Amino acid sequence: MATEFTVAEPDVLVATTLFLIERGVTPYQFSVAAGKGIDTSGATERLRSAFAAIGRSPRFSGNGPDILGISDSEWWVVECKGSGTGQPQTQRNNFDRALASVVSYYEEEPQGVSTQQQGVTVCLCLALPATRAYLNELQRRVRSPLRRRLNLWVLLCEPSSRSIKPVSPDAQF
């Protein structure tokens, strides 16, 4: 995979956070990835700074979904994944782990929210760079019936601009 398609997971997480805020969803918990080549402290600082600008302080967790967010009508559970320069098999394995994680977060009702927020819609979300490898896997393995049943959104992070293209559960890739 070419280097222009390298998108670090923290970049996907920050772009997804900005998308959620624009949608009216308040992210309240983050689990920032750690590992080889990942600038965890940089991503954490970027999130802290962004939230300080709006007078909030995000909560960080060492495990679970990458982002939890709530609005008056939606509860978002987000799994983010970056792309690297690894072999195609590595990219497929990363995709498999991300898909398995987001599906494992499925709930019929929001968890850990106030009683006033219990009736909101649960939105699962897989946020990925819009690379050829990930797009192929999405088209091949994450078909519309599954996305509709789970209310699974896919957020595609454009590698060059880091902007998000949302794909709703009813839309095609």
Question: Predicted regions: what is each one?
Answer:
Residues 81-141:
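Catalytic cores of nucleic-acid endonucleases
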Residues 123-173:
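Domain-level recognition of nuclease-like catalytic cores that cleave nucleotide substrates
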Residues 2-25, 35-41:
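Nuclease catalytic cores
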Residues 4, 29-77, 91-94:
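Active-site metal-binding core of divalent-cation-utilizing nuclease and nuclease-like domains
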Residues 21-22, 72-74, 120-122:
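Short glycine/proline-enriched coil/turn segments at helix->beta-strand junctions
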Residues 72, 117-119, 147-149:
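Short, well-ordered coil/turn elements that cap or connect secondary structure elements
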